[in-house]
Swiss-Prot record:
It comes from Methanocaldococcus jannaschii (strain ATCC 43067 / DSM 2661 / JAL-1 / JCM 10045 / NBRC 100440). The active site is at D223 (proton donor). The record marks C143 as: Transition state stabilizer. This is Putative methylthioribose-1-phosphate isomerase. Keywords: Amino-acid biosynthesis, Isomerase, Methionine biosynthesis. SUPFAM superfamilies: NagB/RpiA/CoA transferase-like (SSF100950). Belongs to the eIF-2B alpha/beta/delta subunits family. MtnA subfamily. Catalyzes the interconversion of methylthioribose-1-phosphate (MTR-1-P) into methylthioribulose-1-phosphate (MTRu-1-P). Gene3D superfamilies: translation initiation factor eif-2b, domain 1, Translation initiation factor eif-2b, domain 2. It is an enzyme of class 5 (isomerase). GO terms for molecular function: S-methyl-5-thioribose-1-phosphate isomerase activity.
Amino acid sequence: MTKDLRPIIWDDDKKELILIDQRKLPNKLEYFICKTYEDVAYAIKDMVVRGAPAIGVSAAYGLALAEINGDDIYKAYEVLKNTRPTAVNLFWALDRCLTAYKEGKSILDEAKKIHEEDIETCKKIGMIGEKLIEDGDTILTHCNAGALATSAYGTALSVIRFAFYNGKKIRVIADETRPRLQGAKLTAFELNYEGIPVKVITDNTAGFLMQKGEIDKIIVGADRILADGTVYNKIGTYSLAVLAKYHRIPFYVAAPLSTFDLRSSEEDVIIEERDEKEVAYIDGVRIVPEGVGCYNYAFDKTPPDLITAIITEKGIVKPNRDEILKLFR
């Protein structure tokens, strides 16, 4: 596992969920203790924990806490489900736990299974995807699709990690990823923590580096992937994909099967809009004039024709319906 960086810990003795408080990184490594499902809901909504797989695992433990504390399971399910609207892993994990509950099984046992499976899944994604990385590559990534966004290893960063573990000399460029700066604060923290060479750039530097020929590949994660290969991911992903297409740079998406949504159409997907204060303020200091509003979309949509391939725990596929559906047979 990625040294001792464990973003999600279940304490069986105290019946508590322990999360790395990602709001405090990179300056402080602190933990947020969840004793109730309400604590978990707050942690997801306020981005104590973030990243589609990590949200799913945390929500599963949240429903387990509701069962342990004798709370109304269906109420807890609704509260947790409504924390964030775009990442499909949240709904997948909650539905799986609710099904277990209806079948008379332990929600906690199901949550533990989801947690363990996520670790193994992310490991497989890395082992499969690293074959796409060549010695000497410079890889651009966006937001944080690492261990902090999952239970371990990550998705996009798992590919990078395993290339590094296998002795490939690589370099990583991390977009800062405004407004929450997950690239600068989290991706750079993770990679530096493991000794993987990384540099941070402002979001608007990416195109210039591509123009200069300094980017060999782009790897990002995903919050939801539709059956036709449409990818919903952190805002700014679409812009990178357009630039990559123009500059003929391979653009890969790394995600587990739990991130695929085979039922929904584009019209069904809600793009989360967060508080405009996240854009208007940096570290508590207002940078936008009073009286001026801000857009703060958390995610965007990347069409499949801009994506080279999708890396999953079952293999690498082209972003089209036929190949994606084969993954689920």
